[in-house]
Structure formats: structure tokens, C-alpha cells
């Protein structure tokens, strides 16, 4: 399975990046691909990626089920650990943006669907990427 994941990521790296794409966008895209496979390996059923609405600038990187909980997952990728942690980039403003988009997504779900927001951090500063999940990083209600 590990070999398949590595091959899939290499294939996606070859297909997805555009030559003129800024380096930080390439890094983010690679992190999201790694997070996608990592989450699947850890039991998540992915139902959407890069979900946007016409009314909000933010997007939900990954949406998936973990058990009976619908998870809205923000992926943060870093190539260095010199500054703040990756999860620190999900500040109050970003959280509120993600909540707005999640509420829009929830309009198509059953009422009272259990939800949570997870943050996946991806560090690419070592030969093997380091990926972690922070489950229930914040709530839909804004608490």
C-alpha cells in the first residue's frame, strides 16, 4: 500500500503542477495530496475536495466522514519549521471563513449532522513528509 501511495503522489505531482504556478501553490497542492492519502489510510471516507461557494473566498480543502462525524479538514503545509507552527496559520479569521463555507455545505446534509473541524499539518522539511491530524481543532459554533 505504501508503494502505491508513493507512486500515486509522484504521478499526481507530474500531472497537476503547471509550469508557471508559484512555488507556494505547488507546495500546498502537494501537501493536500499527501493529506488525502494519509486521511484515507486512517479511516476517513473523503466526499469532497477543494469545496468552494460563489460567495466566499475560502475553500474547504477536504471534507470526509470519520466514523459518523462529518469532518471539515484544513490542510497546512510547510517546508520549514523556522517560524510558527503550521496549525497556527488557522487563526480566528480563517476559522470564521471555514465555518461560513461549512455552513453552506451543510445545507445539503441531514439536519443535526455531527461535525468537527480537523487540521492536518504536513511538513516537507525532511526526506519523509511528517503528517499529523489535530482532530476537533475548533467548533462550528465558534467557541
From Swiss-Prot:
Signal peptide: none annotated. GO terms for molecular function: nucleic acid binding. Gene3D superfamilies: 3.40.1350.10. It comes from the Bacteria. InterPro entries: Restrct_endonuc-II-like, tRNA_endonuc-like_dom_sf, UPF0102_YraN-like. Belongs to the UPF0102 family. PANTHER family: UPF0102 PROTEIN YRAN. HAMAP family: UPF0102 (MF_00048). This is UPF0102 protein Acid345_3985. The lineage of its organism: Bacteria, Pseudomonadati, Acidobacteriota, Terriglobia, Terriglobales.
